[in-house]
Amino acid sequence: MARVTVEDCIDKVENRFELVLLASHRARLIASGTPITVERDNDKNPVVALREIADETLTPEDLKEDFIQSLQKHVEVDEPEAEAVPALSSAPDAAQSDAMGDVQFDRMTEEDLLRGLEGLVPPAATDDDGE
């Protein structure tokens, strides 16, 4: 790449990292068949992309927007909701309280838990541990 081309581009895109991203994106577009806006002059696609940016035949803002759109997987569309979500009441209604009254949980004391754990048998030792 010609140093003159890169130095001409720095006037248009101040950040070198952003310049690399934009020029590489444009070079990929050229490789995929997008028509070029400057004479090729036997240059490769990255050099042509830098020359397009330097000659201002493409604006960096348009390239940046196109680059962002190429990376997006889902495009969000802001649409108003059809109807508002109903607000939750702070007090449960009668149907909910009846349903919750039918639910019972098993309660276990600490002694019952310890007795249950003592009744467990450890797994048998295997010969895989020591060869």
Swiss-Prot record:
GO MF annotation list: DNA binding; DNA-directed RNA polymerase activity
Record field: compositional bias (Basic and acidic residues): 104-115
Gene Ontology, cellular component aspect: DNA-directed RNA polymerase complex
Pfam family, one: RNA_pol_Rpb6
Catalytic activity: RNA(n) + a ribonucleoside 5'-triphosphate = RNA(n+1) + diphosphate
Record's keyword annotation contains Transcription: yes
GO BP of this protein: DNA-templated transcription
Enzyme class: transferase
Keywords: DNA-directed RNA polymerase, Nucleotidyltransferase, Transcription, Transferase
Region span, Disordered: 78-131
InterPro entries named among the record's database cross-references: DNA-dir_RNA_pol_omega, Pol_omega/Rpo6/RPB6, RPB6/omega-like_sf
Gene3D superfamilies in the cross-refs: 3.90.940.10
EC number assigned by the record: 2.7.7.6
Protein family per UniProt: Belongs to the RNA polymerase subunit omega family.
Subunit structure and binding partners: The RNAP catalytic core consists of 2 alpha, 1 beta, 1 beta' and 1 omega subunit. When a sigma factor is associated with the core the holoenzyme is formed, which can initiate transcription.
Role this protein plays: Promotes RNA polymerase assembly. Latches the N- and C-terminal regions of the beta' subunit thereby facilitating its interaction with the beta and alpha subunits.
NCBIfam families named among the record's database cross-references: rpoZ (TIGR00690)
Protein name: DNA-directed RNA polymerase subunit omega
Organism: Beijerinckia indica subsp. indica (strain ATCC 9039 / DSM 1715 / NCIMB 8712)
Phylogenetic classification of the source organism: Bacteria, Pseudomonadati, Pseudomonadota, Alphaproteobacteria, Hyphomicrobiales
Record gene name: rpoZ
